[in-house]
Amino acid sequence: MASEAPHASAPDCAPASSDIPQQDGGSTNGHGHDLKGHGFFALALGSVGVVFGDIGTSPLYAFKEALAAASHDGVTRSEIFGVVSLALWALILIVTIKYVVFIMRADNKGEGGVLSLMALAQHAMGKRTTLVFVLGVAGAALFYGDAVITPAMSVLSAVEGLRTIPALEHGVTNEVVLLIATVMLLGLFFIQSRGTASVGKLFGPVCAVWFGVMFSLGLMNLAANPGILMAISPYYAVEFLAEHGLTGFIVLGAVFLTVTGVEALTADMGHFGRWPIQAAWLFFVLPCLAMNYLGQGAFALTTLETAQAAGKAMPELNWFFEMAPEALRLPLVLLAGAATVIASQAVITGAFSLTQQAIQLGLLPRLDVRRTSETQSGQIFVPQLNTMLLLGVLAIMFTFQTSSALAHAYGLAVTGTMIVTTCMAFIVMRKLWKWSMPMALLFLVPFLALDITFLSANALRFFSGGWLPVLIGAALFTIMATWVRGSQILTDKTRRDSLPVADLMDILRARAPHRAPGTAIFLTSDPDMTPVALMHNLKHNKVLHERNVILTVRTAETPRVSEEERVKIEKVNDDFKKVVVNYGFMESPNIPKALAVCRKQGLKFDIMATSFFLGRRSIVPSANSGMPLWQDRLFIYLMRNAANPTDFFKIPPGRVVELGAQVTV
C-alpha cells in the first residue's frame, strides 16, 4: 500500500526553485562555516579523515597490484619506473587538474556529488532532460557498487598486513584474515545506528597521522634509493605504455586504484567547503601519497637489485608493509586498520547521504531516514540500506577472500561515475557558466578520453570480478528508473481522474455540504488538482471542515532552501488555502515545523483541532500501463515497502486519517 500524500520522491513533485546555484565556492562552505584562520584549518583537518580516507588507503594495494600486473614477463627497472610514473601522473591529471581545478568549481550552493551535479545540470538546461537524468541515475547507481566493494577491499588489505610480521606469518591464514576483517566490519556497521558524531572528531587527526606515517616511510626508502625520483617525469609512464602493449593497458586498470575515492572530493564539499579540501589535497595529502608511492618504488628497486645480485628472481611482496622495519609493522597494521575503518565509514556515510538525496529528488521510494545527531545535519542513518550494505560487503568478502582478487572488481564502477561527472560538468560549463564551445571542449575531450581509456582498461577485468559493481549498478539503475517511470504513470493517471480545485469550488458553492469544526489538511503532490482524500471525504463522509488546507511538498534543485522560501501560501477562498512547502534535496521534510512557519504568515489553526488526511492507494498491475508487467510488479513492491508517510513527514500519528482507493498501473 502506498500513500497519495505529497511524496518527496515522486517525479510530479518537480524540483522548482528561484534560487540560482552558485558557480563558485565563496568564503564559506555549504553550511556557512567561516573559512578563515583556525576554522579553515579545522575544516581542512576534518576533510583529511572524511574526504581523503578512501584515496588515502589506496597505497595499501594499488602499487602492489599494478606491479604484479606489470610483471607478466618479469620485473625490471623499466616496470618499476613505469608503474610509479603512471601512479603519480594519475594523481596529477585526474585528482589535481580534473577534480581540484575544474570539477570542484561546479558546486550546487556549496554541495557536490553526482546527484547534486545532476540537479545543477538540470537547472543549467532550464528543464528536465532525459540525457541528464540518465547520466545522474547511472552515476548514483554505480556509486552503490563502489560502496559495497570499498569496505571489504580496504579492511582486507589492512588485515593482510599481519602476514608481513615474521612472528605471525605462518599463523595468519586466510581464514584468520577473513575472521578479523568480519569482526571489524560487523562492529562498524552495528555502530551506525548510534551515530559517529562522538568519535568523528578523531577521524581527521588519526588520518593525519596515517598520512604522516606514509610520508615518513616513503622518505626513508627514497633516501636509500633516490634514483626513483626520475619517475616523476611522464616520460617513463609513456615509455612503459608504448613498450608493453596489452600488458601496459592491463596495468592501467590496476594503476587506476590509486585514484579510487576521488569522487569524495566533490561529494563532501557541503561539509567542509571547497577551499579547505583543495588546500588539504595540494599541501598535505598529495605530497604524502606521492612520497609513499615513490618510497614503494624505491623499495622495489632495492629489492630488485638485491635479487639480481643474488641471482634470484624478483619476489612478490606486500610492498607497503614490508618497506617498514619489522619492529614497526604491527603498529603500522593497527594504524592501517584504523585508517581503513575510517575510509569505510566515509563511504557508508556517503551512501546514506546519496540515498537521502535520491529520495528527495524522486529517484527512490521513501525510506526510514533517522538523524543520529541533533547538531550535525549530515549525521543520518538509513536502517534498510545499512543492512543491505553489510550483507553485500560480507558476501563479497567471502566470495573473493583476498584483496588481490577484489582488486579486479574495484575500479569499473568508479570509472563509470567519473565519465558521468565529466559529461555533466561539460553541460554546466556550457549552459550555466556560458563557456564557449571550444573552451568547454578543451576540458571535455582530454578528460573524457582519459576516463574512457581507464574504463577500457578496467573492462578487461570484467570477467574476473569487474562484473560485480556493474551488476549492482544495473540493479540500482533498474530500481530508480522503475520508480521514476511508475510514479510518473501514477501521477498522470491520478491527474486524469481528478477534479481541478477550481471546479470543486464551483460545485461546493452550488451544493454546500455539512460543515465540521476544526481544520483539515489534505496532502497531495499536485496543488491544482483535488486531493483523492478530499474527494473521498466528501463522497463517503459528506462533510467539509471549517478550514481546509491543500498541502504540497516540493523538492528544489538546490541542497537547502532558505526559511523565507520555505512556505508559500495561496488563498483560494474563505474555506480553502493552498500551501506549498519547499525543501532542498539535502533536507528532511518536517510538516509540523513547516506549519509553525505558516502560523507566522497568518494561517491560523489549532494543531490539536487539526486532522491530516492521506490517500492510501492499492496498486493493481495492468498490461496497458506503459511498463512491462515485471516492472509493474517491481514498482508495486517498492510502493508497498516505502516508509509510512506519517513517519516520513513527521506528522503526529494521532491526527492522521487515511482513506483508500484502488488504482491500476
From Swiss-Prot:
Compartments reported by the entry: Cell inner membrane
InterPro entries: K+_transporter, K_trans_C, K_trans_N, Kup
One GO MF term attached to the UniProt entry: potassium ion transmembrane transporter activity
Record field: transmembrane: 40-60, 83-103, 131-151, 171-191, 202-222, 245-265, 281-301, 332-352, 380-400, 409-429, 435-455, 462-482
UniProt keyword terms in alphabetical order: Cell inner membrane, Cell membrane, Ion transport, Membrane, Potassium, Potassium transport, Symport, Transmembrane, Transmembrane helix, Transport
UniProt-annotated stretches for the region Disordered: 1-31
Reactions it catalyzes: K(+)(in) + H(+)(in) = K(+)(out) + H(+)(out)
Highest rank taxon of the organism: Bacteria
Keyword Repeat: no
Any single GO CC term annotated in Swiss-Prot or TrEMBL for this entry: plasma membrane
Amino acid composition bias (Low complexity), ranges on this chain: 1-18
Ligase is among the record's keywords: no
Pfam short name (any one): K_trans_C
Entry membrane topology: Multi-pass membrane protein
Role of this protein: Transport of potassium into the cell. Likely operates as a K(+):H(+) symporter.
Family: Belongs to the HAK/KUP transporter (TC 2.A.72) family.
Annotated protein name in UniProt: Probable potassium transport system protein Kup
UniProt source species: Caulobacter vibrioides (strain NA1000 / CB15N)
Lineage: Bacteria, Pseudomonadati, Pseudomonadota, Alphaproteobacteria, Caulobacterales
Gene this chain is encoded by: kup
